């Protein structure tokens, strides 16, 4: 009897023909619904009890979905790193394995943060806009070496952001709920401190932590009040870490100077969001993971994780291109 897999990862669906030889080799039938950004709870419930494994993006695997899909569902293989959209407690209760690719998008996300800092410091987007509107206006900028960076969440991405900041001779503050390795502190000169000190001393604040109960709405009216009036908030992690209305209020009141956002509390960002009309805000559609090399690695590791979770004994010497790629990924 063929195993069935609900295949809903938006970044993989366009290339599904590349992956089919692997699934055919192991007699896996794919269920591929139409997906825009993600599958919501009600969308997933339509397939409850009909699949053995899942390859997903940010689909809403709530406790209700997990309970409805058990006991048939054995593994959820997440494309990417973040698993905050999956109810881990419910999966544990029903013995459903959750898999992901750690350190998947460290480099492109860190590059994105650096790009935002340079844009706000050197003011290129704003000068370009003025020039194209027929205005010859010199907008004052600053060097990154004159700025301090606060990194909230000093994991893989936070460390990569700090290393980039070090190359620009920035003062770096860090905050994390776990102890950071002494060798990294010595390498970068990062000053690990409490959140209040970080916020009150940083010209740029980069959010690079996971979304969890300790970080939900970490940035709110109280924490925005601690920031410098010339400071810029950068969020390339998860939208709900920032209380969006509090951010809008802080920007409108001039409590902070600007924001660069790749993620939002609701995605896609509603068309009536005040953020869309703010000149001191840079926006992107959750795209900081964009990197052909990173995507390729994650595609195949997601498949490998699925096979592992289904208990499939895959061959390291399979002749097909797809399975050979899976084998190479497994060896890494």
Q: Which sequence ranges carry the predicted segments?
A:
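Glycine-rich NAD(P)-binding loop of Rossmann-like domains
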Residues: 126-160, 187
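C-terminal helix-to-coil terminal segments
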Residues: 2, 14, 18-19, 25, ...
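Short acidic/histidine-rich motifs immediately flanking catalytic phosphotransfer sites
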Residues: 48-53, 71-73, 201-204, 228-230
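Phosphate/diphosphate ligand-binding glycine-rich loop within oxidoreductases
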Residues: 50-128, 142
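N-terminal glycine-/charge-rich "phosphate-binding" loop or analogous flexible N-terminal tail
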Residues: 1-51, 328-332
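Oxidoreductase and adenylate-handling cofactor-binding alpha/beta cores
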Residues: 110-129, 163-170, 300-308
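Conserved acidic E/D residue at the C-terminus of a beta-strand in Rossmann-like folds
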Residues: 176
């Amino acid at each position: 009897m063929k195993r069935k897999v609900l295949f809903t990862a938006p970044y993989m669906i366009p290339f599904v023909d590349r992956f089919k030889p692997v699934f055919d080799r192991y007699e896996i039938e794919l269920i591929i619904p139409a997906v825009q950004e993600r599958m919501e709870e009600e969308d997933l419930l339509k397939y409850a009890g009909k699949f053995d494994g899942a390859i997903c993006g940010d689909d809403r695997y709530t406790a209700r979905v997990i309970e409805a899909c058990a006991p048939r569902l054995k593994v959820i293989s997440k494309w990417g790193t973040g698993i905050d959209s999956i109810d881990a407690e419910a999966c544990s209760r029903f013995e459903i394995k959750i898999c992901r690719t750690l350190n998947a998008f460290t480099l492109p996300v860190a590059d994105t943060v650096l790009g935002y800092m340079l844009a706000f410091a050197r003011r290129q987007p704003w000068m370009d806009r003025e020039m194209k509107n027929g205005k010859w206006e010199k907008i004052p900028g600053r060097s990154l070496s004159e700025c301090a960076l606060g990194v909230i969440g000093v994991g893989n991405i936070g460390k990569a952001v700090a290393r980039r900041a070090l190359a620009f001779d920035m003062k770096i503050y860090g905050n994390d709920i776990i102890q950071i390795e002494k060798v990294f502190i010595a390498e970068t000169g990062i000053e690990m401190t409490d959140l209040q000190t970080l916020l009150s001393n940083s010209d740029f604040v980069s959010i690079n932590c996971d979304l969890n109960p300790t970080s939900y709405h970490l940035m709110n009216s109280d924490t925005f009040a601690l920031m410098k009036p010339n400071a810029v908030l950068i969020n390339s992690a998860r939208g709900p870490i920032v209380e969006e209305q509090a951010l809008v209020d802080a920007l409108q009141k001039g409590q902070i100077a600007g924001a660069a956002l790749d993620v939002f509390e609701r995605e896609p960002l509603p068309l009536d969001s005040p953020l869309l009309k703010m000149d001191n805000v840079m926006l992107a559609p959750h795209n900081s993971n964009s990197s052909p090399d990173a995507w390729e690695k994650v595609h195949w590791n997601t498949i490998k994780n699925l096979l592992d979770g289904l208990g499939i004994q895959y061959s390291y010497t399979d002749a097909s291109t797809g399975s050979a790629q899976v084998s190479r990924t497994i060896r890494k």
